[in-house]
C-alpha cells in the first residue's frame, strides 16, 4: 500500500458519519410527515363514516338529536367529545337530510402540536319518513 492510498483513506474517515448525521434526521422528519398524513386521513374517514351513519338515522327519524347520538356512537370516544355535528332535516319526504361532522384536528407529532387542521365529513340522504 502506497503513501497516497493511506492519505486518501485517512481523509475519508469521517465521511460516513457525516452522511448519517444528515440522512437520519431527514428520514425521521419524512416518517413523522407520513405519520401525520395517515392520522389525518384516518380521522377524515371516521368523520365521513359517522356522518353517513347520522344521515341514515336522520333520513328515517324526525328527531335530529337521534342523528347526533348516532354520529357520536359511530365515532371513537376520543373523537366524539371534540366534534361538532350539524343536522339539517326537512319535514318533507323525498327532500335531502344533511349531516355535517366537523373537527379541529391537532397534529400528533410534538414538533407540530401548535398546528391544527379543520376536518369535515358530510353525508346527504333522502328523507324516507
Regions inferred by a protein language model and the residue ranges of each:
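Short, conserved structural patches
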Residues: 2-4, 60, 64-129
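Alpha-helical assembly-interface signal, strongest on the long, hydrophobic N-terminal helix that forms
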Residues: 1-70
Amino acid at each position: 500500500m502506497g503513501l497516497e492510498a493511506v492519505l486518501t483513506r485517512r481523509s475519508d474517515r469521517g465521511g460516513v458519519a457525516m452522511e448519517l448525521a444528515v440522512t437520519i434526521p431527514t428520514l425521521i422528519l419524512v416518517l413523522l410527515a407520513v405519520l401525520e398524513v395517515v392520522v389525518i386521513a384516518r380521522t377524515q374517514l371516521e368523520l365521513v363514516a359517522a356522518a353517513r351513519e347520522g344521515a341514515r338515522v336522520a333520513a328515517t327519524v324526525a328527531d335530529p338529536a337521534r342523528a347526533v347520538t348516532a354520529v357520536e356512537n359511530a365515532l371513537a370516544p376520543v373523537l366524539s367529545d371534540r366534534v361538532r355535528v350539524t343536522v339539517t332535516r326537512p319535514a318533507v319526504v323525498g327532500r335531502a337530510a344533511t349531516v355535517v361532522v366537523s373537527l379541529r384536528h391537532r397534529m400528533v407529532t410534538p414538533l407540530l402540536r401548535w398546528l391544527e387542521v379543520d376536518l369535515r365529513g358530510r353525508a346527504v340522504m333522502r328523507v324516507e319518513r
